[in-house]
UniProtKB/Swiss-Prot annotation:
Its cofactor is Mg(2+). Disulfide bonds: none annotated. It comes from Buchnera aphidicola subsp. Schizaphis graminum (strain Sg). This is Xanthine-guanine phosphoribosyltransferase. GO terms for cellular component: cytosol; plasma membrane. 5-phospho-alpha-D-ribose 1-diphosphate binds at residues 38-39, 71, 90-98.
Length: 154
């Protein structure tokens, strides 16, 4: 993946709040959120605040190792239940591998992401931003702000 899409903290909060507005419009009485660790943790915290949801759990699936997709995903921890009246939150749906696991674990859940790539898009119930399949998304928790020398000094 040669191109990168840089996500700032501000962008993430704005997009997640847009998702919260959409979820409010569904008029569903949500009982909780399941955050897909780790990418869904920050969006889940924002959604929980905006929707007034106090019950937040996690499902922990190892699918990425820093910047490369793992072929074999490992379920480390599951949340209980079938997902009824639950929002499952991840930061993105990429190839759909993790999303298929989520759908099997929580068939009654409402599955949302902030970003969606073409191969996984149909596996989520809602998302905010379309991303091309060949673009790598850099999330704010994976980056830091650092000094860059002026061009004249290079």
């Amino acid at each position: 993946m040669s191109e990168k899409y840089i996500v700032t903290w501000d962008m993430l909060q704005i997009h997640t709040r847009i998702l919260a507005h959409r979820l409010l419009k569904t008029k569903n009485a949500w009982n909780g959120i399941i955050a897909v660790s780790r990418g869904g943790l920050v969006p889940s915290a924002i959604l929980a605040r905006e929707l007034g949801i106090r019950c937040v759990d996690t499902v922990c699936i190892a699918s990425y190792n820093y910047d490369c997709l793992q072929k074999n995903r490992k379920i480390i921890k599951k949340a209980r239940g079938d997902g009824e009246k639950i929002i499952v939150v991840d930061d993105l749906v990429d190839t759909g591998g993790t999303a298929k696991i989520i759908r099997n674990l929580y068939p009654k859940a409402y599955f949302v992401t902030i970003f969606a790539k073409p191969l996984g898009r149909l596996l989520v119930d809602d998302y905010i931003i379309d991303i091309d399949q060949n673009i790598w998304i850099e999330q704010p928790w994976d980056m830091s702000i650092s000094y860059i020398s002026p061009l004249i000094k290079k």
